[in-house]
Amino acid sequence: RDLALDIGSYPHRFLTFDRLHILVKGLHLPVPCVQHSIRRVEFDAWLLERSGAPVVQHTVRNIREEEGAYIVDDAFRSRYLIGAGGTRCPVYRTLFRELNPRASELQTVTLEHEIEYDWRRPDCHLWFFDHGLPGYAWYVPKQNGWLNVGIGGMADRLKAGPRSIHDHWSMFTQMLGGRLAKGARYDPAGYSYYLRGRVDVARRGNAFIVGDAAGLATRDMAEGIGPAVRSGLEAAEAILHGKEYRLEDVTGASLGGGLASRLLDWAMT
C-alpha cells in the first residue's frame, strides 16, 4: 500500500502465504495471514528503476557542509541529503552519530543466506527462542526455486549467553537439514541493525536519515523494510512540500501492536 504496488504488474518473483507456522519451544501455532515474499535484489532494483532517478554507484568517504549545500567527496553537490545506507550509513556517521547515539541494548545481529533450492514446503516458518536464542529463525520460500533462511537475536544478550550466533546457526541449519531443506548448503552473511528506540534528531538542516540509518526496525519482529519505506516517504514529503519530518508513526509493529507484539517486544528487549 505504501508503495502503490500493483501485484499483477510486478515482473519478478512474488509468492503469497496464507498462513505462518510459528513455533515457540516446541509449540506449533499455524496462523492465518496474508504475507508476501520477494527477492530483495530484484525488488530493490525494480523500485529504483520505477523511480526514474539517475543512479551513480559510489563509495562515500567524506561529507561536508558548504554554503548551504552538502559536498560528497568533492564529486557531488546537493541542497538536500538523505542517509539511507543502513546501520553504517556515512550520513549518519558524519552528521548524526553524536546527536542521535544508538542504544547497544537494541542492537541485533543476524546470519542469513538466500539460495537456489527446489523447496517442497511452500509456507513460511518462524522459530522463536530455540536453545535460548534471544530472537528467532526463519525459513521463507521464494517463488521459482529460491529459499531464504536466517537467524537473528539481540547482540548484548548473545554476548552474555553460552552460545554465539554461529552456534545457533549451526543448530538451526542442522534441524532444517532433517526436515525442510535436505541437502541445502549455506554460506551465510552477517549484518547488524537496531530496533526502534529514541530518535532524537533525524533531520539536521536539509540532511535526513531514514530506515536502518535511523534505527527504526520494529520491536516485535525486528522488521525494517516497512519503516524504511515510510520514513523515506516522510523525508520526500518534507523536501517536496515543506512538511515537518516526523518519525513517530513510521515504525509501528509487524504483528499489529496487539498482545503478540507486546509479548515479543518484552521477550526480545
Language-model-detected regions and their locations in the chain:
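Dinucleotide-binding Rossmann-like beta1-alpha1 core, especially the glycine-rich loop
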Residues: R1, V24-W46
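N-terminal FAD cofactor-binding segment of flavoenzymes
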Residues: R1-H21
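Short polybasic amphipathic segments
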Residues: D18-V24, G68-V72
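Short, solvent-exposed loop/turn segments at secondary-structure boundaries
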Residues: V34-Q35, A160-R163, D220-G224
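Predominantly flavin-linked oxidoreductase catalytic cores and closely associated redox partners
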Residues: E49-R185, Y194, R198-V199, G215-L216
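FAD-binding beta-loop-beta segment adjacent to the flavin cofactor pocket
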Residues: Y191-R219, A260-M268
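A conserved FAD-binding loop/helix module that cradles the flavin
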Residues: A217-I239
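Active-site-proximal substrate-binding core of FAD-dependent oxidoreductases
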Residues: A236-T269
